[in-house]
Amino acid sequence: MAGNAKILYVGTAGSDDPTRAGFPFNFAIGALEAGHQPEIFLAGEAAYLMLDVVMGAVQPVAMPALKDMVDTVVARSVPLYV
């Protein structure tokens, strides 16, 4: 893909599946590193991930902690829709 793409990542998994819950954030960070403009939309159970107590407890497999990934996308001004 040439150029700068705008990509929407949709998350529906909640804390019961921490690895799937982390995918939108992990993918958005990868898109940022590749020079694209990611956005994240959280629906259903994924909306609960934005609660501080839940966010701090979610540790996806083979990814940084959810809180660290959320902090990264927020610091990089990635739009986050809940």
Cite the ranges covered by each PLM segment:
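Basic/polar N-terminal segments that are highly enriched at the extreme N-terminus
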Residues: 1-4
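Histidine-anchored nucleotide/phosphate-binding helix
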Residues: 21-34, 40
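Short, glycine-rich nucleotide/cofactor-binding loops
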Residues: 7-22, 53-54
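N-terminal beta-loop-helix "entrance" segment that forms/cooperates
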Residues: 46-60
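Short internal beta-strands
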Residues: 38-43, 80-82
